[in-house]
Amino acid sequence: MANERQSFALVPHDWHSTDYVAEWIVRDAARDAERRPLLRQMLSLAPFPRDAELDVLDVGAGYGVVSEEALRAFSAARITLQDYSQPMLAQARQRLADHSDRLRYILCDLTDPSWPQQVGGPFDLAVSAIALHNLRDPEKIFSCYRAIHDLLRPGGYFVNCDRFVEGIAPHLAELRESGFARVECPWQVPPRAIVVASRAVG
């Protein structure tokens, strides 16, 4: 565990480099066989009909893997993909070109206080996977939780699969502090976990 924590903290990323992103995606795609079932499990925890016309926000969408699975899970969904890496979003556009009429791409930084206004909303569902930990600072992550809560419609859901290197408990507590009515962690193999949080209906 100590070595894993250290590796997460020390890995540098250059998300604005087209070459770096292309090389990173090749390495990342090698984990698809392990990751895809986990993403499907995460999305199955959003209790909406499969044909519901949902407005979905993909936070830290990267090259579109989570959105791709969300389109399969919810056949009528409209998805807004947020990321601060132009090369990543360019890759997502290529990957998801067949669904372009149902997708929006928003280039913005989650550390910019105006990012919620830039993505729009409201949304029925917010999704994120192996993304928010890249903010490094827990307070920045917690700020995102508050923003995501406010971007959801009443009764909306946030499902997140991520690495919680310092443990899951502070994140569950902060999600509750952010206003989510129900917060659960239905799966975890530390440091990874899936979190489900819902906004109150009224």
Residue ranges and their predicted role:
Residues 187-202:
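Core SAM-dependent methyltransferase catalytic element
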Residues 116-126:
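A short acidic, Gly/Pro-enriched loop at the edge of an enzyme's catalytic core
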Residues 55-57, 63-113:
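Class I SAM-dependent methyltransferase SAM/SAH-binding core
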Residues 167-178:
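Short alpha-helix
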Residues 124-139:
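A short SAM/SAH-binding and catalytic strip from SAM-dependent methyltransferases
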Residues 155-162:
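Conserved beta-strand signature within the Rossmann-like core of class I S-adenosyl-L-methionine
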Residues 1-49:
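Conserved class I S-adenosyl-L-methionine
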Residues 142-154:
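A short glycine-rich, Lys/Arg-flanked "PGG" loop and its adjoining helix->strand segment in the class I
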